[in-house]
Amino acid sequence: MTNRTIIAFDFGTKSIGAAIGQELTGSARALAAFKAQDGSPDWQKIEKLLKEWQPDLVVVGLPLNMDGTEQLVTEQARKFANRLHGRFGVQIALHDERLSTVEARANLFDRGGFRALDKGSVDSASAVVILESWFERQLG
């Protein structure tokens, strides 16, 4: 296994969570979430993040319904991933993110109760769950 640096995004129309991880350890940590306007992030802040961390791969969570069907935000997440690739030339992987927010909320609540459940924290914690789930899938 290589030691690639990987960034994950939990796409949302109002907030986009971010996490960074190392493939060798299979672990991730939350980064600051980005505010978005109708799904459009501040691309300068995204560019700054990518320049700072220089990821080998970017994983974008793909929001699906529980039965695996797509929803409106699924297509928006795909567009976000395509724009990341087009603007910055980064390699992209899409990853099923079903139940990532539920797991992230539970993890945050366990650590800090209701006070820990602000929107940005939940979105970035969801990005951690997405990335760690992606790592697990690569091993399995």
Curated annotation (Swiss-Prot):
Enzyme Commission code(s) on record: 3.1.-.-
UniProt GO molecular function: nuclease activity
Gene it is expressed from: yqgF
Organism of provenance: Serratia proteamaculans (strain 568)
Name of this chain's protein: Putative pre-16S rRNA nuclease
Chief localization: cytoplasm
Enzymatic class: hydrolase
CDD domains according to UniProt: YqgF
Superkingdom of the organism of origin: Bacteria
Alphabetical list of InterPro entries matching this protein: RNaseH-like_sf (IPR012337), YqgF (IPR005227), YqgF/RNaseH-like_dom (IPR006641), YqgF/RNaseH-like_dom_sf (IPR037027)
Subcellular location: Cytoplasm
GO cellular component, one term: cytosol
Record-linked SUPFAM superfamilies: Ribonuclease H-like
Keyword tags: Cytoplasm, Hydrolase, Nuclease, Ribosome biogenesis
Function: Could be a nuclease involved in processing of the 5'-end of pre-16S rRNA.
Gene Ontology biological-process annotations: rRNA 5'-end processing
Family, similarity comment: Belongs to the YqgF nuclease family.
